[in-house]
Amino acid sequence: MNKLQEADLQININKCKFHVQKIIFLEFLMSIKKLKMNSRKMQAVVDWSTFNNLTQMQFFIDFCNFYQRFIKNFSKIVHSMIQLIQKKIIFEWNEVCQIVFNHMKRYMIKTSILHHFDQTCETILKINLFNYINDEVLSQYDDEEVLHSIVFYSKNMFFAECNYEIYDKKLLIIIQAFKHWWFKLKLTDISIKMFIDHQALISLMKDKELSRHQMRWVQKLIDFNFRIMYWSDKQNIKINALTR
C-alpha cells in the first residue's frame, strides 16, 4: 500500500485481493514465480476447427500472436499461414495448411511455463537467425543452477534488412533483442551472457574498424552489461554446457 501511495496511485480496496498465490491477469495465469497461459484459452485452441476463409485464419494468427512470448520459433512456425494471407489469393485449405495448423496447436497446448525475470540472477540471451527469421530466447538460472525460460521473441526481417551483409544482419538482431527487452536487461546485476552463431561479433564492443552505421548501432548497447559468446547449431552444444 505504501508503494502505491508513493506512486500516487489510488485503488478500490473492495476490488483488491491480498495474499493470493496465483491470479488470472490480462489472460495470463500469474503465480509468485511463474507465468502460464490461461487454461480456458488453451481449451479454445484444442477445440479450434479448420478455417473457411482468410479472415478466420487471420483471427487465429492474431490469437496465437498474443501468446507468442511462450512459443519458441513462433515466426518460423506460423510463416506459411502468414504468406497465404499476404498473397491475398483465393483461399484454399490444403495439406500444408493443415500440417502448419496442427503444428501450431501442438505448440500452443504444450507450451513452456515462463518464469519471472529476476535482476539478481545470471541471465542468458540466445540469438539465432535462420531464413531471415530472428529467434531469441531469454533465460535465467535459479538458486539451484537450473536454467528457466523467461520469454521468447521471434520476428521476420524486413525486405530491406534481408539484403544486409551477414555481419550487419547478426548485429541488427542483437540490437533488436536489447531494444525489445531493455526494461529487463538494463537492470541486471550480473553480466549477461549472449550467445550468437557468428564469431566475428565476439569482439564487437572492442572493434575499431566499424562502419559509421555500425558505430551508431553499437552506441545503443553501451548502457548494457553483457558479454558475447559463440555457439553453433552444427556443434549441437547446449547452452547449459557452455555457461557452466
Region spans (language model):
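Two-metal-ion RNase H-like nuclease active-site motif
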Residues: C121-L129
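C-terminal reverse transcriptase regions that engage the nucleic-acid substrate
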Residues: L9, N14-C121, T243
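Catalytic palm subdomain of template-directed nucleic-acid polymerases
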Residues: M1-D8, I24-K34, Q43-V46, A160-C162, ...
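A short acidic Gly-Thr/Ser loop motif
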Residues: N128-Y132, D197
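A short, polar/acidic, helix/strand-boundary loop motif
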Residues: E144-L172, Q176, Q199-I202
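Acidic, metal-ligating active-site segments
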Residues: N131-Q140
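RNase H catalytic domain
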Residues: Y141, I175-D233, I237
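C-terminal functional segments of enzyme domains
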Residues: F28-K33, F226-R244
